[in-house]
Amino acid sequence: MRALLQRVSSASVAVDGNTIGAIDHGLLIFICAMPGDTKDTSARLAAKISRLRVFKDDAGKMNLNLAQTGGAALVVSQFTLAADTSRGNRPGFSGAGKPAEAQALYEQFAQDLRALDIPVQTGQFGADMQVSLCNDGPVTLWLDTADG
């Protein structure tokens, strides 16, 4: 699985002009399932993200995780994280997981975060979404479970 994380002071996602998910302080997580990903992959990624110390402590150092700051996660599916731009000018997306499997893993990932006591809001899998955010930092991280 691939995830692009952004530390935010607020974020929301809308479909057809209607807000379907919103958080204040926390992480906006764009997520993409890849071929070969499993429920175990999802659980490991959720655990890793829940432990990431990317929030400032009283000394201003990135030393606190999401739970320690009372933050939430907004999880948004984004198959374009699987883009292959190695040839030509149009990205290819054949490396993304199959839609039915990807949707199941997207939903599993949100559940895995909730099981770790992280409040979670979500987008709508496969929908054309409008995402708004106020980046905090900015802090943006790329995680790929294929990298270990």
UniProtKB/Swiss-Prot annotation:
Question: What's a BP term from Gene Ontology annotated to this protein?
Answer: D-amino acid catabolic process
Does the record's keyword annotation contain Cytoplasm? Answer: yes
Localization annotation = Cytoplasm
Keywords (alphabetical) are: Cytoplasm, Hydrolase, RNA-binding, tRNA-binding
UniProt cross-references to Pfam families, sorted A to Z: Tyr_Deacylase (PF02580)
Span(s) of short sequence motif Gly-cisPro motif, important for rejection of L-amino acids: 137-138
- Say if the entry is tagged with keyword Transmembrane helix: no
Provide one Gene Ontology cellular component: cytoplasm
Q: Which domain of life is it from?
A: Bacteria
Q: Which Gene3D superfamilies match?
A: D-tyrosyl-tRNA(Tyr) deacylase (3.50.80.10)
- Major place of localization? cytoplasm
Q: What is its EC number?
A: 3.1.1.96
Q: How does it assemble?
A: Homodimer.
Q: What does this protein do?
A: An aminoacyl-tRNA editing enzyme that deacylates mischarged D-aminoacyl-tRNAs. Also deacylates mischarged glycyl-tRNA(Ala), protecting cells against glycine mischarging by AlaRS. Acts via tRNA-based rather than protein-based catalysis; rejects L-amino acids rather than detecting D-amino acids in the active site. By recycling D-aminoacyl-tRNA to D-amino acids and free tRNA molecules, this enzyme counteracts the toxicity associated with the formation of D-aminoacyl-tRNA entities in vivo and helps enforce protein L-homochirality.
Its UniProt domain note says:
A Gly-cisPro motif from one monomer fits into the active site of the other monomer to allow specific chiral rejection of L-amino acids.
Q: Which PANTHER family match?
A: D-AMINOACYL-TRNA DEACYLASE 1 (PTHR10472:SF5), D-TYROSYL-TRNA TYR DEACYLASE (PTHR10472)
Family assignment from sequence similarity: Belongs to the DTD family.
HAMAP family the record matches:
Deacylase_Dtd (MF_00518)
Protein name as it appears in the record: D-aminoacyl-tRNA deacylase
Name the species this protein comes from.
Answer: Roseobacter denitrificans (strain ATCC 33942 / OCh 114) (Erythrobacter sp. (strain OCh 114))
